[in-house]
UniProtKB/Swiss-Prot annotation:
Source organism per UniProt: Bartonella tribocorum (strain CIP 105476 / IBS 506)
Record-annotated membrane-spanning stretches: none
A Gene Ontology biological process term: translation
Subunit-structure text: Part of the 50S ribosomal subunit. Forms a cluster with proteins L3 and L19. In the 70S ribosome, L14 and L19 interact and together make contacts with the 16S rRNA in bridges B5 and B8.
Record InterPro entries: Ribosomal_uL14, Ribosomal_uL14_bac-type, Ribosomal_uL14_CS, Ribosomal_uL14_sf
HAMAP family assigned: Ribosomal_uL14 (MF_01367)
Xref: PANTHER family: 50S/60S RIBOSOMAL PROTEIN L14/L23, LARGE RIBOSOMAL SUBUNIT PROTEIN UL14M
CDD domains: Ribosomal_uL14
Keywords: Ribonucleoprotein, Ribosomal protein, RNA-binding, rRNA-binding
Protein name as catalogued: Large ribosomal subunit protein uL14
A Pfam family hit: Ribosomal_L14
């Protein structure tokens, strides 16, 4: 459950380390984002010589949340931290590698490129 002002880790090698959600896309009154949703983020911490720098405003896909994700079979999955992957306007990842596991729910949201780059799909 991601809302405005939420800080997230970046799960790719785009150069950003931490980002902050500044808008949840998908309707004027939408308050929360979950796994697979697209948000607008501001880069708060970045590594030197990365593709992005501190202060950049980007779009990102939420890939992990500390809030439970309930599945159709009744099982629940949750992660230790909130994480996102930076994407361009065509919803393609900016980085070339994804770090950490990603949930299967991204497949239903048409983020196949992120799933193919991820080392583990839960």
């Amino acid at each position: 459950m991601i809302q405005m002002q939420t800080n997230l880790d970046v799960a790719d090698n785009s150069g950003a380390r931490r980002v902050m959600c500044i808008k949840v896309l998908g309707g004027s009154k939408r308050k929360y984002a979950s796994v697979g949703d697209i948000i607008v983020v501001s880069v708060k911490d970045a590594i030197p010589r990365g593709r992005v720098k501190k202060g950049d405003v980007m779009k990102a896909v939420v890939v992990r949340t500390a809030k439970d994700i309930r599945r159709a079979d009744g099982s629940v999955i949750r992660f230790d931290s909130n994480a996102a992957v930076l994407v361009d306007n065509k919803k393609e990842p900016i980085g070339t590698r994804i770090f950490g596991p990603v949930p299967r729910e991204l497949r239903g949201r048409n983020h196949m490129k992120i799933i193919s780059l991820a080392p583990e799909v839960l």
